[in-house]
A protein has these predicted regions:
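Short beta-strand micro-motifs within the conserved protein kinase catalytic domain, predominantly
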Residues: 170-181, 189-190
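Conserved catalytic-loop aspartate of Hanks-type protein kinases
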Residues: 309
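Glycine-rich ATP phosphate-binding loop
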Residues: 123-146
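Activation segment/activation loop of eukaryotic-type protein kinase catalytic domains
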Residues: 244-301, 330
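A conserved short helix/loop substructure at the end of the activation segment
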Residues: 391-403
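C-terminal lobe substrate-recognition/regulatory segment of protein kinase catalytic domains
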Residues: 343-393
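Structural motif in protein kinase domains
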Residues: 188-204, 325
Length: 435
């Protein structure tokens, strides 16, 4: 049979090869840009201008994406990933990198800082909810604790921008003006953990009314903090410094937990420094802390470490167990004075105290009554003991977050098995009305 000249001769037994991709034909909506490509004008209405002091003369178009390990090289397009996934869709799923914004863009987004301020219990600094570069965001104004050069900020921002985890609120970018740094975070719909546990309008109600909902929060926060300590900083010992119940967002409608203010301590110059001069300077500076979450060594030196993060996390776990604040004051009628009660002390009494009722009885009496006594006692006791290990006074005796996250994951699985066993049968109907 004659073959037409317009059709190529093809071996019926051969396997067709995937076509080579042309880097010059990258889709326009791709989130991966080359270093020489100019940012799209649709990403922000405010033109990019050089940063104000102390970064005068530098371009704000710098993004940490140039050094991010999440870039998708065009050479991998020669390999077929899925018949349903295109290169552009893969690029769209890659996390975006944090960037340095023009201060004029922050000023325009906040209406020259005259816009309605966001009521945030997670931070004592001023904050605004606004739209920055087309994204719903929260802008926090914080004071720089030490002078930082341009290279210092770029180095820290590069490391932080490579860190992406489901339990961490994403940092979109920063801007610096004078002695203040403006941290731009994504806005997450939900409420902070402290408000979820303690509703002043209705103290008998909580959205976290089941044991599994609280175990989910504990697991999310443990793995998020483990990621910050052991993965996010790569070769740097990253410290969060602001671990507290008001700094944890319980998302809607999934009721998962996200840690707020990741990278704030690093970018504000609040982290530990090396050398005798740096130690003396840190001792002279004022430091911020929340009562009940500060470890003994942090209160003595003002220096935050990973061990002080572990201490604060242990306090958060005890909050989840009881629903109470870390420290409260109770009036003592015999002395006529108020007595400070720590959730750490009550936890130790619950698992280590004496009495005829035993550990189970003391634990049931100590745990949040709004759980309606429906929780696995064995898992609750083990979780309490893990938290007490985290809040030991000697920082060297505290475990690291990798060990803690592993223990809590096992307790989560054990609690899940318990929840499946006690789950109410759906095929049985119950009526409490009189017949």
């Amino acid at each position: 049979m004659a073959v037409r000249a317009s059709e190529p001769v093809r071996n019926p037994n051969s396997v067709p090869r995937p076509a080579m991709s042309d880097p010059s034909r990258t889709p326009r909506n791709s989130s991966s840009k080359s270093q020489g490509e100019k940012p799209s004008s649709s990403s922000s209405k405010t033109p990019k201008t050089p940063l104000s002091d102390p970064f005068r003369g530098t371009s704000s178009s710098y993004t940490a994406a140039s050094t991010s390990s999440y870039r998708l090289d065009s050479s991998v397009a020669t390999t077929s990933v899925s018949s349903h996934a295109s290169l552009s869709s893969l690029r769209d799923t890659l996390p975006e990198s944090a960037q340095i914004y023009d201060f004029s863009e922050i000023r325009a987004a906040t209406n020259n800082f005259l816009g309605k301020r966001h009521s945030s219990t997670s931070s004592s600094s001023q904050s605004w909810r606004c739209v920055v570069s087309g994204k719903d965001a929260l802008v926090f104004q914080r004071k720089l604790r030490k002078s930082m050069t341009r290279s210092d900020v770029l180095q820290k921002l590069t490391v932080i921008s490579k860190s992406h985890f489901t339990s961490i609120v994403k940092l979109l970018g920063v801007s610096i003006s004078g002695e203040h740094i403006y941290l731009v975070y994504e806005f997450v719909q939900g409420s902070d953990l402290g408000l979820c546990l303690r509703n002043k309008m209705n103290p008998d109600f909580t959205v976290l009314s089941t044991w599994m909902s609280r175990m989910q929060i504990a697991t999310d926060v443990a793995h998020g903090l483990d990621y910050i300590h052991n993965t996010a900083g790569l070769s740097i010992d990253m410290v969060h410094k602001h671990v507290k119940s008001s700094g944890i967002i319980v998302t809607e409608p999934s009721f998962n937990a996200k840690i707020c203010h990741f990278g704030a301590a690093e970018l504000c110059g609040e982290t530990r420094e090396d050398g005798p001069q740096a130690t003396a300077a840190a001792a002279e500076r004022q430091f911020e802390g929340v009562r009940g979450y500060m470890s003994p060594e942090f209160k003595a030196t003002g220096v935050a470490t990973q061990k002080s993060d572990v201490y604060a996390f242990g306090v958060v776990i005890l909050e989840l167990m009881t629903g109470k604040e870390p420290v409260t004051y109770k009036f003592d009628r015999s002395s006529g004075n108020y007595r400070l009660i720590s959730v750490i002390e009550t936890a130790r009494e619950a698992v280590e105290g004496g009495g005829e009722e035993g550990v189970e009885g003391r634990l049931r009496r100590w745990t949040d009554k709004r759980l309606r006594d429906s929780f696995p006692v064995d898992a609750a006791e083990k979780l309490t003991r893990v938290a007490l290990q985290c809040v030991q006074e000697d920082p060297d005796k505290r475990p690291d977050m990798k060990w803690v996250a592993g223990k809590i994951s096992k307790l989560y699985l054990a609690s899940k098995i318990w929840a499946e066993r006690v789950k109410f049968p759906t095929e049985i109907s119950v009526s409490l009305a009189p017949r």
